[in-house]
UniProtKB/Swiss-Prot annotation:
Pfam families assigned to the protein according to its UniProt record, in alphabetical order: HMA, Sod_Cu
Keywords, in A-Z order: Chaperone, Chloroplast, Copper, Cytoplasm, Metal-binding, Plastid, Stress response, Transit peptide
Organism domain of life: Eukaryota
Protein's recorded name: Copper chaperone for superoxide dismutase, chloroplastic/cytosolic
Range annotated as the organelle transit peptide: 1-67
Cellular compartments annotated: Plastid, Chloroplast; Cytoplasm, Cytosol
Organism: Arabidopsis thaliana
Gene: CCS
Domain HMA residue range list: 86-149
Record lineage: Eukaryota, Viridiplantae, Streptophyta, Embryophyta, Tracheophyta
One Gene Ontology term of the molecular function aspect: superoxide dismutase copper chaperone activity
GO cellular component, one term: chloroplast
Biological function: Copper chaperone for the superoxide dismutases CSD1, CSD2 and CSD3. Binds copper ions and delivers them specifically to CSDs. Is required for assistance in CSDs disulfide bond formation and thereby activation of CSDs. May be involved in the negative regulation of heat stress-responsive genes and thermotolerance.
């Protein structure tokens, strides 16, 4: 069960202007706006599978095409105004008919930051291009009355590791932190926590994923550029703001952060907003998670559980 649930529950990458091109061109114009244009084309996303040799070839051919050149100029103008870069996010949704497809698309297209939505009914997969956080998309899908599981996030490019996740499993603090590689120089970070004390908490990436003594054994702040004076430590993630219910949400981006270098390290949350040298309040190990086109399994190979038979208790008990 562990193999499917980890990749389903914990998958989450951010597109800088230069790397938005392959997604923008490859993404099918299947939203309501494209249906009014008889000349629009719909692309099959089967090439996004990592096992397909077409993946890298298509990305390269799109970038070098005249169409890509035209879109590059247009997207560079608009990308500077966006708070967050775009990502391709995949959900598996329990859909059985075209009515389900329309309900899902119509709901998602009302969310701010979503540019395109494509639904693959045969595989029960919904692909979303946009800058909206996973939390907003998940809530929208739940409001349609259909079961949905996040199965992948990133960009259709040949990164060594495109996505990673850290799960906080209690007993008091629960949460999920998702990292997604947008370009070689940019990563997107999204986090949800419950069970924190109200107020401001500092948080960071520490060197080691050793939880033998909890956060105290995770080492010091991750800072591969420590020889460069005047630069902020790469592992410093700033602060989290927990509301009166102890819930905190974060969505941001980090330059020079490479997701592949984070695997095996730890995310640590601290009690206050100015103490990253203390033992820490809680910690979780950063593990690889599924990127785009990497996780279409509906059946767990370890115990035969179907994805829709999994209960909420099988997943991290946090509002993510």
């Amino acid at each position: 069960m562990a193999s499917i649930l980890r990749s389903v529950a914990t998958t989450s990458a951010v597109v800088a202007a230069a790397s938005a091109i392959p997604i923008a061109i490859a993404f099918s114009s299947s939203s309501s706006s494209s249906s009014t244009n008889p000349k629009s084309q719909s692309l099959n996303f089967s090439f996004l599978s990592r096992s397909s040799p077409r993946l890298l070839g298509l990305s390269r051919s799109f970038v070098s095409s005249p169409m890509a050149t035209a879109l590059t100029s247009d997207r560079n103008l608009h990308q500077e105004d966006r708070a967050m870069p775009q990502l391709l996010t995949e959900f598996m949704v329990d859909m059985t008919c075209e009515g389900c497809v329309n309900a899902v698309k119509n709901k998602l297209e009302t969310i701010e930051g979503i540019e395109k939505v494509e639904v693959d009914l045969s595989n029960q997969v919904v692909r979303i291009l946009g800058s909206s956080p996973v939390k907003a998309m998940t809530q929208a899908l739940e409001q349609t009355g259909r079961k949905a599981r996040l199965i992948g996030q990133g960009v259709p490019q040949d990164f060594l590791v495109s996505a990673a996740v850290a799960e906080f499993k209690g007993p008091d603090i629960f949460g999920v932190v998702r990292f997604a590689q947008v370009s070689m120089e940019l990563a997107r970070i999204e986090a949800n926590f419950t069970g924190l004390s109200p107020g401001t908490h500092s948080w960071c990436i520490n060197e080691y994923g050793d939880l033998t003594n909890g956060a105290a054994s995770t080492g010091s702040l991750y800072n591969p550029f420590q020889d460069q004076t005047g630069t902020e430590p790469l592992g410093d993630l700033g602060t989290l703001e927990a509301d009166k219910n102890g819930e905190a949400f974060y969505s941001g981006k980090k330059e020079k952060l490479k997701v592949a270098d984070l695997i095996g390290r730890a995310v640590v949350v601290y009690k206050t907003d100015d103490n990253k040298s203390g033992p820490g309040l809680t910690a979780a190990v950063i593990a690889r998670s599924a990127g785009v086109g990497e996780n279409y399994k509906k059946l767990c190979s370890c115990d035969g559980t179907v994805i829709w038979e999994a209960t909420n208790s099988d997943f991290v008990a946090s509002k993510v």
